[in-house]
């Protein structure tokens, strides 16, 4: 399940650097999208790539793409339902 991130909620862009996006919502919450790419520990040719979602400085969820040699291997989503509830409240 992919949680839709509606950027219309963003009131202003606070910071944009590299692939990290940080913005403030209409009600003053800070949302951060942080890109990551790391080698997978158990297989040298695998990389874990994706975005981490932070709300008000707390890690809430991440979307992962498992890649090898630049090709998509499989994808998964790890989240907790608080993220859905808090974004709806924004």
Locate each region found by the language model:
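Mixed-charge, Lys/Arg-rich low-complexity intrinsically disordered regions
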Residues: 1-19
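Intrinsically disordered, low-complexity repeat segments enriched in small/polar residues
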Residues: 6, 28-30, 70-71
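Tryptophan-anchored aromatic micro-motifs
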Residues: 22-26
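Solvent-exposed strand-loop boundary residues in beta-sheet-rich modules
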Residues: 27-29, 56-57
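Short beta-strand-centered aromatic/proline hotspots
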Residues: 30-40
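Lectin-like carbohydrate-binding module/patch detector with strong preference for beta-trefoil
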Residues: 39-44, 71-74
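Intrinsically disordered, low-complexity, charged/polar segments
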Residues: 53-90
């Amino acid at each position: 399940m992919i949680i839709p991130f509606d950027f219309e909620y963003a009131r202003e862009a606070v910071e944009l650097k590299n692939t990290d996006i940080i913005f403030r919502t209409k009600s003053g919450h800070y949302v951060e999208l942080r890109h990551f790419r790391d080698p997978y520990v158990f297989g040298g040719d695998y990389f874990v790539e994706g975005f981490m979602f932070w709300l008000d400085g707390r890690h809430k969820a991440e979307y992962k793409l498992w890649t090898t040699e630049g090709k998509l291997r499989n994808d998964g989503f790890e989240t907790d339902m608080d993220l859905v509830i808090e974004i709806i409240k924004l």
